[in-house]
């Protein structure tokens, strides 16, 4: 399995699927399964029985994971979806860079 180019907290845009074009922030990254959970994307409904914790029960909406290959990172400077490159700085630290404008991504 390849390395994921996105991390928790990154702003991304969905490029394929039913939520294509939606933008959001990554809530959770699951590298073992190569999946990410993006806020407001791939929202599913879960039916739950009444429990002590949730005496009402009912239908809850929550975000489900999507494959990390279906999202692209949004560059903070050029505000466009971009591929991620890596560059080693003079002091030896690795940084992710925008392939479109060359800006370092945090």
UniProtKB/Swiss-Prot annotation:
GO molecular function: rRNA binding; structural constituent of ribosome
Family matches, as InterPro entries: KOW (IPR005824), Rib_uL2_dom2 (IPR014722), Ribosomal_uL24 (IPR003256), Ribosomal_uL24_CS (IPR005825), Ribosomal_uL24_KOW (IPR041988), Translation_prot_SH3-like_sf (IPR008991)
Signal peptide limits: none
Recorded GO CC terms: ribonucleoprotein complex; ribosome
Entry-linked SMART domains: KOW (SM00739)
GO BP: any one term: translation
Origin: domain of life: Bacteria
Keyword terms: Ribonucleoprotein, Ribosomal protein, RNA-binding, rRNA-binding
CDD domains xref list: KOW_RPL26
Annotated family: Belongs to the universal ribosomal protein uL24 family.
UniProt subunit comment: Part of the 50S ribosomal subunit.
NCBIfam families according to UniProt: rplX_bact
PANTHER family, per the entry: MITOCHONDRIAL RIBOSOMAL PROTEIN L24
Purpose: One of two assembly initiator proteins, it binds directly to the 5'-end of the 23S rRNA, where it nucleates assembly of the 50S subunit. One of the proteins that surrounds the polypeptide exit tunnel on the outside of the subunit.
Protein name stated in the entry: Large ribosomal subunit protein uL24
Species in which this protein is naturally found: Desulforudis audaxviator (strain MP104C)
Protein's gene: rplX
